[in-house]
């Protein structure tokens, strides 16, 4: 399998069949899936998310409903098709809200698992109204997809972005506050991630939330800025797609810039000045035709 390429070129990785099987059983048990349930396979087979949907179907005896990966997966299923489980990326879910037919079919799915990228706040608010279970997942290729889940709607929903590890998964932090995962059933070694996190054990169980990637920390003039926090602060005020990125600077060491599809850079800079602290403000607004993304739909930030 290939890694997602979040921080560079996707890398080839060997996965053990026994560990893929263990991961599949963990998911099916967590979601209460049973033999005969229908699983929608709508993700590319080139990456772990698509492969694991097939493995889950084989291991847990689910009926596969396989369609060509596309941005509007709900257009490829019938109104009377009963889907018990579907895994999608945020873009597919967002696109499926665009018309009544797709929305109706999406709402009929019994378990929707969303992974591969952050879920926009506005999208999450809409998903909270869904009648069946919607989950946000945390994981990566090295853990053979997700090792933690967060309920978005219904009972036990968590709107504060806390994830709960699946049974058999241990969570700690390293000296840089990055998440360390000990999941021997799916990963042969302890995995040190690049995700800065907060771990909480005060509720009688372990939970964690992701602050951002350590790769996305901008050290500008002695001030450390987490790119994801800047994006979250700006998101409610900007309608056009945008991302923040960092580049080398002779003056500051590193500096933050914004890439945006918006036409009016002056207005965008005004919003940044009004909303952001002084040291969070981008040094330049770069207008692009389309925000650069990886093959798995994640922002491509290593551009400079």
Where are these regions (language model features)?
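Active-site glycine-centered loops adjacent to acidic/histidine catalytic or metal-binding residues
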Residues: 6, 116, 139, 195, ...
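Gly/Ser/Thr-rich phosphate-binding loop
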Residues: 99-156
């Amino acid at each position: 399998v290939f890694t997602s390429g979040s921080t560079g070129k996707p890398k080839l990785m060997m996965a053990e069949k026994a560990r893929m099987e263990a991961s599949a059983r963990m998911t099916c048990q967590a979601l209460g899936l049973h033999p005969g349930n229908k699983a929608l396979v709508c993700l590319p087979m080139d990456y772990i998310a698509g492969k694991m949907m097939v493995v889950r179907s084989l291991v847990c005896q689910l009926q596969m409903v396989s369609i060509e990966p596309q941005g509007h997966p709900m257009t490829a299923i019938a109104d009377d098709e009963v889907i018990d489980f579907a895994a999608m990326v945020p873009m597919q879910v967002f696109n499926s809200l665009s018309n009544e037919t797709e929305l109706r079919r999406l709402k009929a799915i019994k378990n929707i698992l969303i992974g591969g990228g952050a879920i926009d706040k506005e999208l999450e608010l809409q998903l909270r109204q869904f009648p069946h279970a919607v989950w946000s997942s945390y994981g990566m290729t090295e853990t053979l997809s997700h090792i933690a889940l967060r309920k978005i709607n219904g009972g036990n929903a968590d709107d504060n972005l806390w994830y709960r590890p699946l049974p058999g998964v241990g969570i700690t932090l390293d000296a840089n506050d990055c998440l360390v995962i000990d999941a021997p059933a799916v990963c042969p070694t302890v995995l040190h991630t690049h995700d800065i996190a907060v771990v909480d054990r005060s509720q009688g169980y372990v939970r964690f939330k992701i602050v951002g990637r350590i790769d996305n920390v901008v050290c500008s003039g002695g001030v450390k800025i987490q790119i994801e926090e800047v994006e979250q602060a700006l998101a409610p005020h900007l309608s056009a797609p945008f991302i923040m990125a960092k580049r080398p600077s002779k003056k500051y060491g590193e500096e933050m810039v914004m890439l945006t599809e918006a036409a009016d850079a002056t207005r965008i800079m005004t919003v940044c000045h009004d909303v952001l602290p002084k040291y969070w403000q981008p040094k330049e607004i770069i207008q692009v035709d389309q925000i650069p993304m990886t093959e798995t739909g994640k922002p491509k930030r290593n551009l400079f």
